[in-house]
Amino acid sequence: MNSRVRTLYKIAAQPDGPAQARQIIAEELSSWLPAGVVNDIKLIVSELVTNGIVHGSAERDTPVLLDLVVNGKIHCRVLDHGPGFATHTRRQSAGGGWGLRVVEQLSDRWGMQHSPQRTVVWFERQPCELRE
């Protein structure tokens, strides 16, 4: 797999933002990784960008940032301008709330940092299909 130090993208805080993020992931990773891994990463990124748009971008002109690093493993961060929330207090409902569960299931590691002005959710994924 080729190495890349870092690529930073601005994703419009609009309804098509998650699709834009999935397209970026497909363009960046499809030639390097098996389709199943790329699809997992597209799903994770789509969930995080959706959360960033819905919960973090009160003003639609403020983009969500997608920070993609490929260096032996995939490390990705999604940054928005929302205050975040405590993951242990988040409850799933029929209408939503399953995004971070998807992130947890499909990534090798993930985490979140937040302040009153910004939330960063990150994940790591090894570039192989065989994982425990």
Predicted regions and their residues:
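STAS-typified acidic loop motif
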Residues: 8-19
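Conserved short strand/loop->alpha-helix "switch" segment adjacent to the catalytic nucleotide/phosphoryl-transfer site
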Residues: 22-46
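Short amphipathic alpha-helical interface segments enriched in basic and hydrophobic/aromatic residues
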Residues: 30, 50-54
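Short alpha-helix carrying the canonical HExxH Zn2+-binding catalytic motif
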Residues: 45-46, 50, 102
